[in-house]
């Protein structure tokens, strides 16, 4: 009887894991595109975007972190079930590998976004200093 319950639990957990993996995959694609598109700043400082790109990025990051935590929890539950064959062991390992890959991809995207933001901040401050220098040197002539 316990074996039949384990099989039902296994199938339910496997289905949940696949659903979360698909959802995470789609969100990572959107997250990656958002990270790439944030490089373009508005030329006219009077224009203000309706949603701050960094705010949207952080919200998406939070959503993905929550999904990754859920997937980790499901993988842990799967690991507690008694495997009844090589196929089940392989499937458990595959889900763990997918989670690891998603975490690596998520961290890479987030780190690239932070590096791009830092670079843009630095370039922006250098541009301001150059403009200030031009204005001051123009007055001294």
Report the location of each language-model feature.
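Regulatory linker/N-terminal fringe of the SNARE motif in t-SNAREs
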Residues: 2-16, 23-141
């Amino acid at each position: 009887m316990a074996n039949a319950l384990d099989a039902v639990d296994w199938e339910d957990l496997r289905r949940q894991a696949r659903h979360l993996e698909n959802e995470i995959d789609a969100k990572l694609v959107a997250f990656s595109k958002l990270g790439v598109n944030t490089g373009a700043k508005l030329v006219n400082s009077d224009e203000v975007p309706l949603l701050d790109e960094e705010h949207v990025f952080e919200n998406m990051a939070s959503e993905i972190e929550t999904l990754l935590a859920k997937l980790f929890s499901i993988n842990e539950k799967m690991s507690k079930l008694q495997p009844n064959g090589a196929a089940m062991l392989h499937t458990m390992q595959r889900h763990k590998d997918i989670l690891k890959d998603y975490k690596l991809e998520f961290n890479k995207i987030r780190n690239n976004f932070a590096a791009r933001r830092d670079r843009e901040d630095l370039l922006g401050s250098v541009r301001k200093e150059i403009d200030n220098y031009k204005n001051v040197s123009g007055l001294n002539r």
